[in-house]
């Protein structure tokens, strides 16, 4: 039975209605006979709001404490989406930084993944659950939460998919593909159907923010194929390999 890792970006789960749509995509994969692991970002612009909140107490320089604040956005998303899934009759359990098995260095606010132990994720899959993983976070050697920097939920999805040897790693984004230009500015712009890792590097370096650059390097190292998709249609927009 193949494993699909589905990562939902913040704008694709910005409210409960969008979470219900995300849950139908999970159900679609389960109906096709796949095991599913879900990775979530914080809802909408929650991370920015938390940073702004920290700024009101001049706290942005305290990176350890920022991590303790910011990781809550993804935890909130994971808990709510799990509630939606369970409400639909899907066996699901949310996880957290202490049990997802992502071990990092101690560079708070921009930690690097050092090791992934997916045994707890595999255990839930074997028990018939959909693990719902809060992205963007890991745990250092002192048992403290760390965050992986901007776009870190993409990193979470890619390292988990690589460790599980997933059949698919699908990143659901509000734009649904990689485009030659910003589709929000130019609605007639064409998309890339397929890109190599190197081509995507170059596009990201020119300012594209659809995929986290560090996640591309990890995918390339593990020969992991990444798909960018639209959650409304479940149509794959761009494949990166």
Give the location of each predicted region.
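Nucleotide/pyrophosphate-binding catalytic subdomain
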Residues: 1-220
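Conserved glycine-bearing catalytic or ligand-binding loops at nucleotide- and phosphate-handling centers
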Residues: 218, 222-236
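Terminal amphipathic helices with adjacent charged low-complexity linkers/tails
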Residues: 41-47, 233-240
């Amino acid at each position: 039975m193949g494993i699909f890792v589905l990562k939902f970006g913040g704008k694709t789960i910005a409210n409960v209605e969008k979470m219900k749509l995300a849950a139908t995509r999970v159900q679609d994969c389960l109906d096709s006979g796949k095991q599913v692991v879900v990775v979530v970002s914080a809802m909408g612009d929650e991370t920015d709001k938390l940073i702004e909140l920290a700024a009101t107490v001049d706290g942005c320089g305290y990176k350890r404490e920022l991590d303790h604040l910011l990781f809550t956005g993804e935890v909130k998303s994971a808990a709510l989406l799990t509630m939606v899934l369970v409400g639909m009759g899907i066996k699901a359990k949310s996880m957290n930084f202490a049990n997802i098995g992502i071990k990092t260095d101690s560079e708070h606010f921009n930690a690097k993944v050092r090791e992934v132990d997916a045994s707890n994720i595999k255990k839930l899959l074997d028990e018939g659950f959909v693990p719902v993983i809060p992205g963007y976070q890991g745990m250092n050697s002192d048992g403290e939460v760390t965050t992986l920097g901007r776009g870190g939920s993409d990193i979470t999805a890619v390292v988990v998919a690589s460790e599980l040897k997933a059949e698919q790693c699908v990143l659901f984004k509000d734009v649904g593909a990689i485009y030659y230009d910003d589709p929000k500015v130019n609605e007639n712009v064409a998309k890339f159907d397929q890109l190599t890792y190197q081509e995507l590097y170059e596009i990201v370096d020119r300012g594209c923010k659809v995929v986290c650059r560090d996640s591309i390097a990890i995918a390339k190292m593990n020969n992991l194929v990444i798909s960018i998709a639209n959650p409304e249609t479940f149509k794959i927009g761009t494949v990166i390999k």
